[in-house]
Amino acid sequence: MLPRIERLADRFERICYGQLEYAGEAYELCALGSRPWDASLPAGLITGGVHGYETSGVMGALAFLETRAAAYAGRVNLLVAPCVSPWGYERINRWNYDAVDPNRSFRADGPSREATNLIQLAQPRQFLLHIDLHETTDSDEGEFRPALASRDGTPFEPGLVPDGFYLVADAEDPQLDFQQAIIRAVEAVTHIAPPDDAGQIIGCPIVAPGIITYPQRDYGMCASITGAPYTTTTEVYPDSPRATPRQCSDAQVAAVCAALDFVLARHRG
């Protein structure tokens, strides 16, 4: 991952926005931004690897910068944090070193340094769009949800892992037209997760095909940090027999492009 970031630094501003130190090991927090940053243009934040083990979010963010970002030069400012949780990425872990879930900790006084450093990076800027790239994996159900129940002393209730791509919109302002534009683009790349027999995905009622909502700010989710009018969290299913790692990365890229295209079409000039 780091060599790819270094190569991209020829085209984007490489920003070190913090450093984590865990058990004597240091992890630099890196982002890449439009160069120059034009204050007259709208801005989009793209984040990946909030859960470090969700590989396609990291790979998709980097692939977007490598293959598609040039098409948006002069139209939108981009700030991309491709791997918010590098310790988790290296160790294939959902949580950070302190057994904290970063994607429930995005508050200024929260316990996750991955989260607080990203908040400080984003805070000085105004964003029209924030898309946060995630996966739902079999290990969520088989490993991390049982571990969460054990950690918190609560019963573990088995669930179903959705087979396919879906989006988590903000319950307070879901912007369904925006979400549906992303779903339409992604379904050309990979399949969209169907609801279960109760009409739900991960226990939440669908509000449109492939779309559920969470109260992002209440849950301390990454997608809540900017207050942008257009936000979403992508979820790819990499363990599906119907999807390859390349498709998962391509789905993330398609989601980012569709999100940018929708917002730019709505906010010309």
Question: Predicted segment positions?
Answer:
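Structured catalytic-domain cores with a bias toward divalent-metal coordination
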Residues: M1-G269
